[in-house]
C-alpha cells in the first residue's frame, strides 16, 4: 500500500464510521437528550466532571476547555472539572489506593447531585472510569459517557450513553471529538438562545 492509498483508506474509514452514526436515529435522540441535560445542569448551577485515560484524557481536557472558555459564542464561563488533570491527586490516590481508584476518589470529592459526570473510554470498560461512574451514581449525579465498541460496562450504567460502534480506537476517538464539538454547539445554542424552538 502506498502512502497516498493509506491516507485515502484511513479517511474513508473515518467517514464510514461517521456515516454510520449519522444513520443511527437512537444515537441522535440520545445525543439531543444529553445536550439538553448538560444545558439544564449548567443552567441550574451544576458543573461537568469529566475524565478519561490516554487519548480520552485529552478529549476530556478539550471538552472542558470548550465549556470553561467558549466554543463559538460569546457567553459567560461555565464550570467543568477534569479529573485526569490533577496530577498530584491522581498520583497520591494511585499510590495509596491503586490506579483503579484515581477518578472515583476525586469524584467523591467534587460531585454533587446537581452535577454531571462524563466518562470517556474507547473500550467502554476502563476500570477507573467505571468506578468513578458508579461513585457518581451513588452520589446522585447525572451520568453520561462517550464510549466505543458495544458500549461496555460504562455504556450500560450511564444515563446518557453515546456509543460509537467501532472496534478501532483511532476511529472512535475521531468520532468522540466530533461529538464533543456538536454537544458544545448545542449547549451554547440552548443557553444563549433559551427561547429558540428546537
Predicted regions and their residues:
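Conserved hydrophobic/aromatic pocket- or pore-lining residues that grip, position, or stack substrates
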Residues: 38, 52, 67
Amino acid at each position: 500500500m502506498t502512502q497516498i492509498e493509506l491516507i485515502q483508506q484511513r479517511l474513508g474509514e473515518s467517514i464510514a464510521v461517521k456515516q454510520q452514526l449519522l444513520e443511527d436515529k437512537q444515537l441522535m435522540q440520545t445525543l439531543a437528550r444529553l445536550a439538553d441535560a448538560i444545558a439544564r445542569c449548567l443552567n441550574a448551577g451544576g458543573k461537568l466532571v469529566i475524565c478519561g485515560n490516554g487519548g480520552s484524557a485529552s478529549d476530556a481536557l478539550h471538552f472542558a476547555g470548550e465549556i470553561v472558555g467558549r466554543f463559538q459564542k460569546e457567553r459567560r464561563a461555565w464550570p467543568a472539572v477534569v479529573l485526569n488533570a490533577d496530577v498530584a491527586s491522581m498520583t497520591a490516590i494511585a499510590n495509596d489506593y491503586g490506579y483503579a481508584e484515581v477518578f472515583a476518589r476525586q469524584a467523591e470529592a467534587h460531585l454533587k447531585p446537581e452535577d454531571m459526570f462524563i466518562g470517556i473510554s474507547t473500550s467502554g470498560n476502563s476500570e477507573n472510569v467505571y468506578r468513578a461512574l458508579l461513585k457518581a451514581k451513588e452520589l446522585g449525579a447525572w451520568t453520561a459517557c462517550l464510549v466505543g465498541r458495544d458500549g461496555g460496562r460504562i455504556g450500560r450504567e450511564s444515563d446518557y450513553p453515546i456509543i460509537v460502534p467501532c472496534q478501532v480506537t483511532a476511529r472512535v476517538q475521531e468520532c468522540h471529538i466530533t461529538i464533543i464539538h456538536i454537544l458544545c454547539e448545542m449547549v451554547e445554542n440552548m443557553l444563549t438562545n433559551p427561547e429558540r424552538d428546537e
